[in-house]
Swiss-Prot record:
Mg(2+) binds at residues 533, 535, 864. Residues 2-66, 117-243, 465-989, 1033-1051, 1118-1132, 1188-1204 are cytoplasmic. This is Endoplasmic reticulum transmembrane helix translocase. Gene3D superfamilies: Calcium-transporting ATPase, cytoplasmic domain N (3.40.1110.10), Calcium-transporting ATPase, cytoplasmic transduction domain A (2.70.150.10), HAD superfamily/HAD-like (3.40.50.1000). Residues 889-933 are annotated as: Disordered. ATP binds at residues 533-535, 626, 684, 749, 864-868. Keywords: Acetylation, ATP-binding, Endoplasmic reticulum, Glycoprotein, Magnesium, Membrane, Metal-binding, Nucleotide-binding, Phosphoprotein, Protein transport, Translocase, Transmembrane, Transmembrane helix, Transport. It comes from Homo sapiens. It is found in: Endoplasmic reticulum membrane.
Length: 1204
């Protein structure tokens, strides 16, 4: 998946988006500044995908900066100098001195880096090979900068086509989305305008395309209805990886080692690199093939064109078509996003949202023609998304006028196709999301600069000291200085970080959690505030109807068996439930519980019949569905009068008690007291309204407005529903709080119910909870009021911190809206101190999350993926729980990716081994069991590769999706996040220490003639590689710790521990070096010959053993372990790797195998000196360990940020 973003219009020379825009753009040439400033305005403000568009014109080959300075100046200058004998050699070309070769090598290196920088950065590529063009009509390419976390910058070709009016139309395609230039009005590139914002009258009266010319124009404008990708071949993907900066840097280092005559080591390192990159490319190709299968498979569909229904392939549909949608015997998926015009559908949206509850879709034929389609508000009820499956449909009534499909399907209008659909958007997230996971780039850069200071000092020392010997080869000396400088940039870093994140992705997938944006995993380790929705997240879906209150005196709850017939009718008819062909009832769990409680039966033709009481059944005619903003739902139903065929129409309404109060013509005097008291006990309360409308004509019934039903109602009771907490909610919330996190509830439910649940779960631990009451009259102030009404306080203008120390705070949607309008600064100060946000609309949930982020808190949001989409998307870590999913898996028989998922044809996948097992004769049972075992082994191996997020696993709602409905998944995400964060931090410490030890040994010791043999370097590299591989595969502990990890790489603890540990190692190395020198024969010459063949010596053997021991000690000391990850003894592969390294060091020190020692160029060490080395190594380890642990105790445990 990592390179999936390469698909699309890449630059011809293979430039790949890796650039990070430092301050905007490359320096302009001779263009005026005013025009440059206008550049980004070529894209509309607020575009979801593209942040800026910059037009460019490609330069002729010889004018490009990758060719001109080198071919036109530097190479000719070098040849001219060579011809003129400037380098000081004779007439023979064979006698080229090293200085000339050095200059030539520097020019070639500069040339290679210049060319490669165009591959690494699109910004650099544009600066080198293109010229900015301020008239888009003259441009040939555009540089497209995406919005944050939406992929990488790309240079894409600018296409020219003829428009409908005969004028030239400029367009480009970025991440499969087409943008066209509006040259007449806006002078901007705009995404293709789909017909999604028109009045309902436009869709209701639409008759599709009447002429072939209209169809051709639409096909030209919108393209085909395909959401597929091309999988690049192996060589193309490998070339992309082989030109990546770190890979090139490693190859450069290998070249330097070859020049320094480390042949075995160089070949070993290069082979490992190539093998690792090749395996990644193979995995990438497998992943891309998987993603490719996710698109919809074309099938025939009925479309109304040229005034008649005709079958066409689903990939030929264009926006504006009228299509027939219905249940398909082949289980075909809906091919695109459509607006339902006529007929009703029940749709399984699991492939898109992950929700297991099928959704009911209503037509817009009877809605107000003047209303404008709002995709955000109307999509849940009237839009059927591409990639979903219609499980049942009710065709339009034959008696009505309008289009009727020949296949008895429902009539729908095509809104969006291809990658522009909701399914296409999810596919694009999987395809073009952030490519590689990296640490904070700025911090990494500062850290490397910090190490570079030491490397420059070491290189300067080598050069100054080395040039004191006039006979010394300056070329070799320069090579050594270059090697020292390269040693501080750890080339393993990107691989290590990728391994750490991939380990977390695999672990989460095994826990039925899927992630579409892996870069968010380290954020989970930094989370400070955890926000939860209440209904369906903290509380269970298995609801209990206690009865109906308000029918008798006080808050007494009447059992459902004793309620009057009007209340029965209101409960039986006011819902959005539907019945499937197999008799299954689908819809909201609360409504299911209510219908079950009153014991009425719903039929397929929208009729309800009582089973427990003797009264007439009801026929539901119109539903005005529940909306979060309105907080109510109403229906128009009818029943037959006794002894007559005349229909008596009724209106039934249910909703929030405070919303319905003004709609009742009569209600009990203690109305507010009743619902308030019951809500305080934690129950969910909905008011019920009813009224008889008498006789209506069919026309009147069809045209009745919502407002006509929702007035002059008779109060028929409060339905009281208990929402029990999920089994593990209490334990999980306690664990999250104990792990130093603040927990907050953000719900659309009643504030009193929310506060009760918050108290049960210990969100609230104060004696009194204050709810902010907005002013009842103009000119008055907001006031805090306790739940029982005993405390009333004015809204403090000062810091809310003092108030929060004494009371728990609850903010309602009304209070939030009032403060937003009157005192936004006070609201921002208040938000971090509030424990419960109640009666908030989805947009307000989003506002709370974005406010917390703006205040600097790393925020997690956990919700149900339908009402909470905005909040989940904006949180640093958004986790969608799937409704009606099991809370836990009892026995895990298969891996998540083996679970039945809908393939592109809609047919359920079956296990290969299951097919093999079916119907085999007894003689074949033996080989089959072996095949099964082999399949299991292969599956287990595949288990360890990064999981591909499939449609149905991922949700369009959030970056993380849990297939289980328990909030235990929050603990899993935080554990994996902390583990990844700590792994990154320890990786930096280890790489920094190894780099510093290497810089010292390559400088001071190098000048003393200490160098390692080729075999020595190879053995050291092999042992290091094993440790690096296994340290990144650490697993988190079972429980979360109170201690928080350090959120950043660059901090006082890390700097001090690296410096102190290096100081201890430095002293040990200097001491042993001097001791070894004292036991060696005295040097005769003044200057050491640095270029003679490697000769084993006591000094070399001592320093080599010491350096190896220090590097292994660095791993053991800096492995973090508890409380964030398993301890060192539990990380078996790393323990074995360190044990092998330790045995190798002991074996080399004791000289137990003389042949082995001589092979690696080690001499026999005197026994008394062996003891000295062992003691120093032990002391070095203990002191470095002590330094790290003391610093960790004082500086290594950050505290949770307390709101001020």
């Amino acid at each position: 998946m990592a390179a999936a973003a390469a698909v699309g219009n890449a630059v011809p020379c293979g430039a790949r988006p890796c650039g990070v825009r430092p301050d905007g753009q490359p320096k302009p040439g001779p263009q005026p500044r005013a025009l440059l400033a206008a550049g980004p305005a070529l894209i509309a403000n607020g575009d979801e995908l593209v942040a800026a568009v910059w037009p460019y014109r490609r330069l002729a080959l010889l004018r490009r900066l990758t060719v001109l300075p080198f071919a036109g100046l530097l190479y000719p200058a070098w040849l001219g100098a060579a011809a003129a004998g400037c380098w000081g050699w004779g007439s023979s070309w064979v006698q080229i001195p090293e200085a000339a070769l050095l200059v030539l090598a520097t020019i070639c290196l500069a040339h290679a880096l210049t060319v490669l920088s165009g591959h690494w950065s699109v910004h650099a590529h544009c600066a080198l090979t293109c010229t900015p063009e301020y008239d888009p009509s003259k441009a040939t390419f555009v540089k497209v900068v995406p919005t944050p976390n939406n992929g990488s910058t790309e240079l894409v070709a600018l296409h020219r086509n003829e428009g409908e009016d005969g004028l030239e139309v400029l367009s480009f395609e970025f991440q499969k989305i087409k943008y066209s230039y509006d040259a007449l009005e806006k002078k901007q590139f705009l995404p293709v305008a789909f017909p999604v914002g028109n009045a309902f009258s436009y869709y209701q009266s639409n008759r599709g395309f009447q002429e072939d010319s209209e169809i051709r124009a639409a096909e030209k404008k919108f393209g085909s209805n395909k959401a597929e990708m091309v999988v690049p071949d192996f060589s193309e993907l490998f070339k992309e990886r082989a030109t990546a900066p770190f890979f090139v840097f490693q190859v450069f280092c290998v070249g330097l080692w070859c020049l320094d005559e480390y042949w075995y080591y160089s070949v070993f390192t290069l082979s490992m690199l190539v093998a690792f990159e090749a395996s990644l490319v193979q995995q990438q190709m497998r992943n891309m093939s998987e993603i490719r299968k996710m698109g919809n498979k074309p099938h025939m569909i009925q479309v109304y064109r040229s005034r008649k229904w005709r079958p066409i392939a689903s990939d030929e549909i264009v926006p504006g078509d009228i299509v027939s949608i219905g249940r398909s015997p082949q289980e075909n998926l809906v091919p695109c996003d459509v607006l339902l015009l006529r007929g009703r559908c029940i749709v399984d949206e699991a492939m898109l949202t992950g929700e297991s509850v099928p959704q009911m879709k209503e037509p817009i034929e009877d809605l107000s023609p003047d209303r404008v389609l709002d995709l955000q508000a109307d999509s849940r009820l009237h839009v059927i998304f591409g990639g979903t499956k219609v499980v049942q449909h009710i065709p339009p009534q034959k008696a009505t006028t309008g289009l009727k499909p020949v296949d008895s399907g429902c009539v729908a209008y095509v809104l969006r196709t291809g990658f522009n659909t909701s399914q296409g958007k999810l596919l694009r997230t999987i395809l073009f999301g952030v490519k590689r996971v990296t640490a904070n780039n700025l911090e990494t850069f500062i850290f490397i600069l910090f190490l570079l200071v030491f490397a420059i000092a070491a290189a300067a020392y080598v050069w100054i000291e080395g040039t004191k010997d006039p006979s010394r080869n300056r070329y070799k000396l320069f090579l050594e200085c270059t090697l020292i400088l390269t040693s501080v940039v750890p080339p393993e870093l990107p691989i290590e970080l990728s391994l750490a994140v991939n380990t977390s992705l695999i672990a989460l997938a095994k826990l039925y959690m899927y992630c579409t944006e892996p870069f968010r995993i380290p954020f989970a380790g930094k989370v400070e505030v955890c926000c939860f929705d209440k209904t369906g997240t903290l509380t269970s879906d298995s609801l209990v109807v206690r009865g109906v209150a308000g029918l008798r005196d006080g808050k007494e709850v009447t059992p459902v068996s004793s309620i009057p017939v009007e209340t029965h009718r209101a409960l039986a008819s006011c819902h959005s439930l539907m019945q499937l062909d197999d008799g299954t009832l689908v819809g909201d769990p609360l409504e299911k519980a209510m219908l079950t409680a009153v014991d009425w039966t719903l039929t397929k033709d929208e009729k309800v019949f009582p089973r427990s009481i003797k009264t007439q059944g009801l026929k539901i005619h119109q539903r005005f569905h529940f909306a979060s903003a309105l907080k109510r739902m109403s229906v128009l139903a009818s029943y037959e009068k006794l002894g007559s065929t005349d229909l008596c129409y009724i209106a039934a309404v249910k909703g929030a008690p405070e919303t319905l109060h003004s709609m009742f013509s009569q209600c009990p005097p203690d109305y507010h007291h009743i619902h308030t008291e019951i809500s305080r006990e934690g129950a969910r309360v909905l008011a019920l309204g009813y009224k008889e409308l008498g006789h209506l004509t069919h026309q009147q019934a069809r045209e009745v407005k919502r407002e006509a039903l929702e007035c002059s109602l008779k109060f028929v009771g409060f339905i009281v529903v208990s929402c029990p907490l999920k089994a593990d909610s209490k334990a999980v919330i306690r664990e999250i709080q104990n792990a130093s996190h603040r927990v907050v509830m953000i719900t659309g439910d009643n504030p009193l119910t929310a506060c009760h649940v918050a108290q049960e779960l210990h969100f609230i631990e104060k004696a009194h909870t204050l709810i902010l009451q907005p002013p009842s009259e103009k000119g008055r102030q907001c006031e805090w009021r306790s739940i029982d009404g005993s405390i009333v306080l004015p809204l403090a203008r000062g810091s809310p911190k003092a108030l929060a120390l004494e009371y728990a705070l609850c903010l309602t949607g009304d209070g939030l809206a009032h403060l937003q309008a009157t005192d936004p600064q006070q609201l921002l100060r208040l938000i971090p101190h509030v424990q419960v946000f109640a009666r908030v609309a989805p947009k307000q949930k989003e506002f709370v999350i974005t406010s917390l982020k703006e205040l600097g808190y790393v925020t997690l949001m956990c919700g149900d993926g339908t009402n909470d989409v905005g909040a989940l998307k904006h949180a640093d870590v958004g986790v969608a729980l799937l409704a009606n999913a099991p809370e836990r898996v009892v026995e895990r028989r298969r891996r998540p990716r083996d679970s039945p998922t809908l393939s592109n044809s809609g047919i359920r996948a079956t296990s290969r081994t299951a097919k093999q097992r079916s119907g085999l004769p007894p003689s074949e049972e033996q080989p089959t069991s072996q095949r099964d075992r082999l399949s299991q082994v292969l599956r287990d191996l595949e288990d360890e590769s990064t999981p591909i997020v499939k449609l149905g696993d991922a949700s369009i709602a959030a970056p993380f999706t849990s297939k289980l409905s328990s909030i235990q998944c929050i603990c899993h995400v935080i554990k994996q996040g902390r583990c990844t964060l700590v792994t990154t931090l320890q990786m930096f410490k280890i790489l920094a220490l190894n780099a510093l030890i290497l810089a010292y040994s390559q400088s001071v010791l190098y000048l003393e003639g200490v160098k390692f043999s080729d075999f020595q370097a190879t053995l050291q590299g092999l042992l290091l590689a094993g440790c690096f591989l296994f340290i990144s595969r650490s697993k988190p502990l079972k429980t979360l710790s109170r201690e928080r990890p350090l959120p950043n790489i660059f901090n006082l603890y890390t700097i001090l521990t690296v410096m102190l540990q290096f100081f201890v190692h430095f002293l040990s190395l200097v001491y042993l070096y001097r001791e070894a020198q004292a036991r060696s024969p005295e040097k005769q010459e003044q200057f050491v010959d640095l270029y003679k063949e490697f000769e084993p010596s006591l000094v070399n053997s001592t320093v080599y053993i010491m350096a190896m021991a220090m590097q292994m000690a660095t791993f053991a000391i800096n492995y973090k372990g508890p409380p964030f990850m398993e301890s060192l003894p539990e990380n078996k592969p790393l323990v074995w790797s360190l044990a092998v390294s330790l045995l190798a060091i002991i074996g080399l020190l004791l000289g137990s195998s003389p042949d082995f020692n001589s092979q690696f160029g080690l001499v026999d060490i005197p026994v008394e000196f062996k003891l000295v080395i062992a003691q120093v190594l032990l002391l070095d380890f203990c002191l470095a360990l002590l330094a790290d642990r003391v610093l960790q105790f004082f500086l290594g445990t950050p505290k949770l940020k307390v709101p001020s």
